[in-house]
Amino acid sequence: EELVDFARRLLIKRQARLEAQRRPTVSVVAPAMAETASAHEFCVPGGAFVSGQHAWARIEPGGQVRIGLDDFARKALGLFDRVSLPAHGTQVRAGDPLFTVGRGDGMVRFPSPVSGRVVASNETLVGEPDRASRSPYDRGWFCLLQPSDLAAELPALRIGKPVIAWYQEEIARLRAAA
């Protein structure tokens, strides 16, 4: 029994060491696939644009833009326990604070990736902030905007393979700082 306990402890230590050495992967996925990704997988939302401040923006069929928090930010922040959303009708410009997430005493503001008027907020997140962590590109969206200058602002956002390269740079930067 003592030998089994000793072997189990060694195995746990080895597993932890291997996990720490494992290099994260980055891939483009369908929105629902991000829900099943491991901690070492960073998911880029297929068909969505990503801002340099880690908000994604997806153009909906009616021309509105759905906005949320990207997988990189949600994994860097961990689980958060509160969300603050803009009021319906709020006018924002690209770069203005749009939504806030918090954990404990800390709060992080995320700027809007595009300019426009808030036409809806995902109020479910106020009562269930972890939904944004569980389903970042599907049910965990934060706001829906009616864009005002989308054609001019889209070139500042990344989509597809450029997001993968940027995530890899961000991961390397984060690991170097650790």
Spans of model-derived segments:
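Non-catalytic terminal segments and appended small domains
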Residues: 1-82, 88, 108, 121-178
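Conserved strand-loop elements at the edges of beta-sheets that form or border functional pockets
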Residues: 59, 103, 112
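A structural signal for short beta-strand/turn segments enriched in small hydrophobics and glycine
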Residues: 86-104, 116, 145
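Histidine- and aromatic-rich ligand-binding microenvironments
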Residues: 109-115
